[in-house]
């Protein structure tokens, strides 16, 4: 199937051209953190994650990632997701808008226009789904998944979701260690997210309010 990204204007390539702060060089993006990881780095990271009770699947293309994710989640499951450019770029967010095989809790949350009720719905249903779909800000070669957000909707779900968390990430997220993960976040991810916030919400930028390190999976959780 054709990959459909409903927000092509929010991709890295688009933001580098259209964001006034980035295009004018007022803000400098560290492009080292956009590079695809080497095969050796990918395999080392996979081995480290698996040693820490995570299940890992490596896929070569966006199409493969889309099909794998679609087939991974059992029909009838409740699902939720946070914002993820990766999920957008593989076409999964677009697919969710019309998919009927799952209980899409994220759509139910966004359909609530009252902010207080939406927050309550997010707390009561958003964190109790069977599957929560997300991405990571960085993944270290020694198997640490690093995430951050500004409001707690992503990080909160990582910790509180009653079911399983699925992290979909490109190999450009792989870094050597925690220090490089922090550098990637503050020198790359935050600046691109700030550009997206300026475009999508007319805000001055984003902020790292919550910063999480997942150092291992739950060793007592059933597969």
Task: Report the location of each language-model feature.
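Eukaryotic N-terminal low-complexity, Ser/Thr- and Lys/Arg-rich leader segments
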Residues: 1-15
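N-terminal active-site beta-alpha-beta segment that forms phosphate/nucleotide-binding
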Residues: 38-123, 128-132
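Conserved phosphate- and dinucleotide-binding cores of soluble alpha/beta proteins
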Residues: 126-223
């Amino acid at each position: 199937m054709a990959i459909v990204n409903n927000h092509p204007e929010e991709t890295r390539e688009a933001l580098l051209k259209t964001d006034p702060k980035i295009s004018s060089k007022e803000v400098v993006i560290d492009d080292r953190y956009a590079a695809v990881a080497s095969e050796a780095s990918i395999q080392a990271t996979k081995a480290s994650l698996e040693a820490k009770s995570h299940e890992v699947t490596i896929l070569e293309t966006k199409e493969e990632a889309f099909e794998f994710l679609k087939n991974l989640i059992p029909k009838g499951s409740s699902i939720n997701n946070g914002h993820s450019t990766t999920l957008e770029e593989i076409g999964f967010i677009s697919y969710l808008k019309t998919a009927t095989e799952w209980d899409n809790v994220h759509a139910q949350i966004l359909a609530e226009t009252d902010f207080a009720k939406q927050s309550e719905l997010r707390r009561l249903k958003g964190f109790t789904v069977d599957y929560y779909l997300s991405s990571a800000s960085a993944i270290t070669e020694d198997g640490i998944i690093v995430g951050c957000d500004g409001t707690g909707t992503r990080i909160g779900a990582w910790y509180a979701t009653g079911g399983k968390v699925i992290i979909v990430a490109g190999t450009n997220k792989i870094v050597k260690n925690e220090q490089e993960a922090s550098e990637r976040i503050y020198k790359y991810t935050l600046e691109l997210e700030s550009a997206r916030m300026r475009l999508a919400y007319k805000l001055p930028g984003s902020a790292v309010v919550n910063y999480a390190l997942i150092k291992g999976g739950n060793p007592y959780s059933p597969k």
